[in-house]
A protein has these predicted regions:
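Bacterial N-terminal signal peptides
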Residues: 8-17
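Stable alpha-helical elements in mature extracytoplasmic
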Residues: 61, 68, 83-86, 118-122
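Thiol/selenol-based redox catalytic cores and closely related redox-interacting motifs
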Residues: 93, 100-178
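Bacterial N-terminal signal peptides that target proteins for export
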Residues: 1-8
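Local sequence-structure signature of Cys/Sec-based thiol-disulfide redox active-site neighborhoods
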Residues: 47-69, 75
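Bacterial signal peptide processing site
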Residues: 20-24
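Conserved helix-turn-beta segment immediately C-terminal to the redox Cys motif
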Residues: 69-89
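Low-complexity, Pro/Thr/Ser/Glu-rich flexible segments characteristic
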Residues: 25-49
């Protein structure tokens, strides 16, 4: 048992690093092809027409971003993927606070959604419509959508609401004890 735990602890950083590094099958290079890709990619999923389009900005090599987009599609969102070589200007334009970045940034219903945030939290945000910039989940917590672990492990994490002034406050807790 200790051998399995040791091996899991050793391999976890490698799995996390390669999850985001693998090329996404849904990568597109321009908004024109992004729209076509969004239609094709969501053809097998049931799209909830009441939900706004999720525009996901990511680098072309990020695989976990595509897995997170699949999570959104499964929750009823139509998703448009946009690849960019430099995410910093996107995050800056959308108001992601310093130190709160992740690998992808989405625009959903007038809000910024940064990182591997569960679709249920996004739906709650859209229902409650707070005066805020959006939601952030810094880093890439193990077990969050798009970062699922083979053993089902979920690292405790907190999704934060970004207020209009750029400050944050807890919005939702996930994982053991959350």
């Amino acid at each position: 048992m200790n051998r399995i735990l040791s091996l899991s602890l050793l391999l976890t950083p490698i799995l996390l690093a390669t999850a985001c590094a693998r090329a996404s099958e849904e990568a597109v290079s321009s908004p024109a092809t992004a729209t076509a890709s969004a239609v094709e990619a969501t053809a097998g999923a049931t799209i909830d027409r009441e939900l706004p389009l999720a525009i996901v900005h990511k680098t072309a090599s990020c695989g976990c971003c595509g897995v997170w987009a699949d999570h959104l599609k499964a929750a009823g969102f139509a998703v448009e993927m946009r690849d960019t070589d430099d995410m910093h200007p996107v995050k800056q334009r959308l108001g992601v606070p310093a130190g709160k970045a992740s690998c992808h940034t989405a625009e959903i219903g007038g809000y910024v959604v940064e990182g591997h945030i569960p679709a249920s939290d996004i739906k709650r945000l859209l229902k409650e419509r707070p005066t805020a910039r959006g939601l952030v989940l810094p880093g890439m917590p193990a077990g969050s959508p798009g970062m699922e672990m083979p053993d089902g492990h979920v690292q405790p994490y907190t999704v934060e609401l970004v207020l209009a002034d750029g400050s944050t406050q807890p919005f939702a807790q996930h994982g053991p004890g959350g």
